[in-house]
UniProtKB/Swiss-Prot annotation:
Pfam families referenced in this protein's UniProt entry, alphabetically: SPOUT_MTase
HAMAP family associated with the record: 23SrRNA_methyltr_H (MF_00658)
Complex and partners: Homodimer.
Family of the protein in this entry: Belongs to the RNA methyltransferase RlmH family.
Compartments where found: Cytoplasm
One MF annotation (Gene Ontology) recorded for this entry: rRNA (pseudouridine-N3-)-methyltransferase activity
GO cellular component: cytoplasm
InterPro entries recorded: Alpha/beta_knot_MTases, RlmH-like, tRNA_m1G_MTases_N
Designated name of the protein: Ribosomal RNA large subunit methyltransferase H
Primary localization: cytoplasm
Length: 159
């Protein structure tokens, strides 16, 4: 299985980079992980809704260019479905059983994701109503992917 994380914005914080590297290393037993960082658009102060939509559309075009035609796409969106860890693990397993070998997770920039990217998604997923920096969300997501594989293995990691 191949897991791709497409993210908008550059990760600068060393502690987050180290955490993501650790979970990527742990996941290498189960899958290949690729992190794709895309440039985020500069948002003017007091930007209008139209300007925000244009920014999300431009970011969306860059995201779309990195999605494979046969990828199962999961976007992180506040309006998405929330999963307990066990159910998320089952969902990833079901995706693989249904013939998808490439799963792409997408984390948008500070404005979120364009409508086009949300429409391309096979699944919209949410980690709740909290607002988190998208850089921190990368670490949370990759830890949950690792946890999902450990649940599938019956590992005590999840306990």
């Amino acid at each position: 299985m191949n897991i791709k994380l497409i993210t908008v914005g550059k990760l600068k914080e060393k502690y987050l980079t180290e955490g993501i590297a650790e979970y990527t290393k742990r996941l290498s037993r189960f899958c290949k992980v690729q992190v794709v960082e895309l440039i985020d658009e500069k948002t003017p102060e007091n930007a209008s809704e139209a300007q925000n939509n244009q920014i999300m559309a431009r970011e969306g075009e860059r995201i779309q260019a990195k999605i494979g035609s046969r990828d199962y796409v999961i976007v992180l969106a506040i309006e998405g479905k929330q999963f307990p860890s066990e159910e998320f693990s089952q969902k990833l397993e079901a995706i693989a059983v249904n013939g998808y070998s490439d799963i792409t997770f997408i984390i948008g920039g500070s404005l979120g994701l364009s409508k086009a990217i949300k429409q391309r998604a096979n699944l919209k997923m949410s980690f709740g109503l909290l607002t988190l920096p998208h850089q921190l969300m990368r670490l949370v997501l990759i830890e949950q992917i690792y946890r999902a594989f450990m649940i599938q293995q019956g590992s005590p990691y999840h306990k």
